[in-house]
Amino acid sequence: MIDLQFSSFYFYISSMTRSSFFHRISACLLFFLGVLLLNACADEERKLPPTSPAGEGTSSQVLVLCQGNQATRLPGGYTLIDTEHQTVNHDAFLSVNGKLLGDAPQEAIQHGAKIYIPCYGSNLVQVVDASSHRLLRSISTSTPEGVAAWGKYVFVSNNDGNVSRIDTLSLTVDRTVAVGPNPVGVSTQDNYIYVAISDGYNYKEGYKQGFKVVKLHPNTLEQVGEIRVGMNPTRIYKDDFGHLFVACQGDYATHAAEIWRIDQKDQAAVFASANLAAVDGHRIYLVRSTTDWSTGKTTVQYEVRDTRSGTTIASHFGQVQPPLDPTALAVDPHTKNIYVASRGTLDPKTRFTEPGTVSVYNDNGDFLQRYNVGTEPCVLLFLRK
């Protein structure tokens, strides 16, 4: 389970024309010119088509998924921020449906007109109408965590070692396959499904059955590849150039968190030292948050890099009115504003139970504003029209 209380949780349980002649000459010249240009650009990576249909715009609503806190019986839910009217609805799901979303929601994606939200603690994937926020279906599946969509299917990682496939027409699970211990993040790329295998509960043996991302065929769920990555891989992000970025959380002690990059040939290597990321086009926004658990002090570093070259891009990101304790970040695909979710306090007694915040910065990283949201904000989703 990707719990935003990962660090404390593990400490707790272990202590992307004039004639045909000239026509032919012109065609040949154009052909050879094209060849020369292609050779000159051999090192440039192809940009993939956008993952959303052309003309599909974002609305003014930002869904902030909040985990709550199971230990203290604080329910999960989501806050809706309307950036056009500057309103915040803290009980968006509850107010429409008259019931709670579920325990420990982990991820949220929009596919078509529906939102899919795995709720780990309730063993449910909640399917919600993206416009009205009315609950359409509760789909039973064991300890659901990551979620991604491809065509007519939605794929869900189940922490019990499986991936379930949901048919989006019938809204039922039509196939399940074993993938490895404690799968977390799920992503799609070039018509394949990629799943991070964390072995996250095997901390005593160094997560030794993890360190990998498995590649599945979406139609059969047959495993067609396995990619070695860092320790304890969790969320997976992707750019517009065929790269996947895997957040490997380490062991929260001697092995620091890293972001690994997987290229189009499924070759993986360390890309950066960070535990949180957001990708927009060719930019990856990185957050490295470390806590000294003997003092409770948290140190946060921010960086923006080019996803292709890895070079640092100059930005004010994280330098002006930074959040206290970042838990998630995302970039608005329309405005390019950067949103960073955070816990609301560093007080060890209330750190994981107090309401959180979402800070907004422009594309240069300059601070714009801050919103109050629910407890343990873990996902920022820009809803499409």
Q: Predicted segment positions?
A:
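Short intrinsically disordered, low-complexity coil segments enriched in acidic
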Residues: 1-3, 265-266
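Bacterial Sec-dependent N-terminal signal peptides
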Residues: 2, 8-12, 16-20, 30-63
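Sensor of tandemly repeated, compositionally biased sequence architecture
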Residues: 7-8, 219
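Alpha-helical transmembrane segments
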Residues: 25-29
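Predominantly soluble domains enriched in secretory-pathway, periplasmic, or organellar proteins
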Residues: 42-385
